[in-house]
Structure formats: C-alpha cells, structure tokens
Amino acid sequence: MTTRFKKNRKKRGHVSAGHGRIGKHRKHPGGRGNAGGMHHHRILFDKYHPGYFGKVGMRYFHKLRNKFFCPIVNLDKLWSLVPEDVKAKSTKDNVPLIDVTQHGFFKVLGKGHLPENKPFVVKAKLISKTAEKKIKEAGGAVVLTA
C-alpha cells in the first residue's frame, strides 16, 4: 500500500506523540536502574540474568588445593626417561642423573626391575622403601629434594 507520508511524518502536530499529556514520556515509570527486579521486572531478570538474585554458599579461605597431588613413576619406566645420548655415554664411573620432577613426577615407586649393570642417580621429592632398596642394590643412589 502506498502512502503519501513517511511514518515519521504521521504524528506531526500531535504534541506529546502518544506519550500522555502530563508525564510526556519523562521520568522513570518503571523505577530507576535495576528496580523491580524481584517484582514488575522479574521476567526480564529471570530470562536474561538468571542467578542475579539469591544466595550462594560460603567461600573456603586458605584451602590447600592439590594438597595430595603426587604423580608417580615406577622403576621399570625410569631408564626410559634418560636421553639416548646420555645412555650411550654412561659408564661405571659416569652414571646418569635422572631428575624425575623435570619429567613431571614427584614420587618413585618400586614396581619392576632396573636394567642390569646400569646404575644411576635418582633425584625425587619422595621415594618408596622398595624403590630405594632396588636402586641401591643396582649400585645407584637416591637424592631427595624439597
């Protein structure tokens, strides 16, 4: 349908443009800001801002996160942590040093067997008794770090 006037011309001459005689589209009919969020604006708050109102649980101050984080490595995997060039150079006098913390482990456990006649020094934060015994029997040594 064609019309002579564009929409914005239609209300020319009508003083308050449909916004009333006294208020004339002024002030704050719904309250200022977030007023009425629990009452007359509840639908808007529930739809677009869920969880804005209500309580949340307490915070735990000084919580020791990851207190018991202790990745482990077994004896049978230790020799595979040594680089190939270091393995080739190792002798009875020049034994390789394995720092398990650099590989992301904290504790060494005693599962498995060490390779024959291949002593080495193990550096770890924690070590089990059986692992320490097996390393020392193979001629190696254990260094504990903080």
UniProtKB/Swiss-Prot annotation:
Pfam assignment, any one: Ribosomal_L27A
GO biological process, any: translation
PROSITE patterns cross-referenced by the UniProt entry: RIBOSOMAL_L15 (PS00475)
Residue span of region Disordered: 1-35
Coiled coil: none
Entry keywords, A to Z: Ribonucleoprotein, Ribosomal protein
GO molecular function, one term: mRNA binding
Record carries keyword Ribonucleoprotein: yes
GO CC terms, sorted: cytosolic large ribosomal subunit; cytosolic ribosome; mitochondrion; plasmodesma
Gene3D superfamilies on file: 3.100.10.10
Family to which this protein belongs: Belongs to the universal ribosomal protein uL15 family.
Annotated protein name in UniProt: Large ribosomal subunit protein uL15x
Organism: Arabidopsis thaliana (Mouse-ear cress)
